[in-house]
Amino acid sequence: MHSVSLGLRPAAVTQHHGFYRGENAVGRPVAGALSTHLQYAFSFPASSAFGKMFPTSYQGVGIAYYTFFNHSAIGSPAAVYVFQGARIAQLTETLSLDYEWNFGVSSFWKPNIAVGTKVNAYINAGLMLSWRPLPEWNFSAGVDFTHFSNGDTTLPNVG
């Protein structure tokens, strides 16, 4: 099975450093974000060994664009990543609890004290309720956690 998906992910940004609370060159907080994701996924055929072992698993590649509504202070990064997800529990005939993780690289940051480099690792993990009214359609909503990291390649690196 092959699929293409488009998703929007609104987010709150943790205020763990003064930079995010507005102590930046622009003087405005970085409190929220919105990202758009385009993903291509595939699943193994049900008749294959992997399809039999992992019948609800899917994997693929994705691209994302982020806005933090404060381009001058932090930039508007984009990410390229691989992802994998699967069902955790089937709740009803059409509703399930699923997970997904993403791992890749992000770029187009404006270097600053919080995000010290233009290129960073992108890590994401989430839980979703997925509603499948028809076999060809899937609607998901959930919560996830995203972390961008330069791996201490540039200091200071307050995250």
Can you annotate each of these PLM segments?
Residues L8-T14, F42-F44, I63-F69, F103-W109, ...:
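Transmembrane beta-strands of outer-membrane beta-barrel pores
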Residues L6, T36-F42, V82-I88, W101-V105, ...:
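Residues on the lipid-exposed face of transmembrane beta-strands in outer-membrane beta-barrel proteins
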Residues V30-T36, I74-V80, T117-I123, G159:
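Residues that define the transmembrane beta-barrel architecture of outer-membrane proteins
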Residues H16-E23, A73-G75, K110-A114, G151-V158:
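Outer-membrane beta-barrel translocator domains and adjoining extracellular loop/strand segments
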Residues M1-A31, S35-S43:
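Short glycine/proline- and aromatic-enriched beta-strand/turn motifs that initiate or cap beta-hairpins
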Residues H2-L6, S57-V61, V80, L95-F103, ...:
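Transmembrane beta-strands of outer-membrane beta-barrel proteins
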Residues M1, P45-S57, S72-I74, A89-L97, ...:
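Short loop/turn motifs that connect adjacent beta-strands in outer-membrane beta-barrel proteins
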Residues H17, M128-G159:
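Predominantly the C-terminal beta-signal and adjacent terminal strand-loop region
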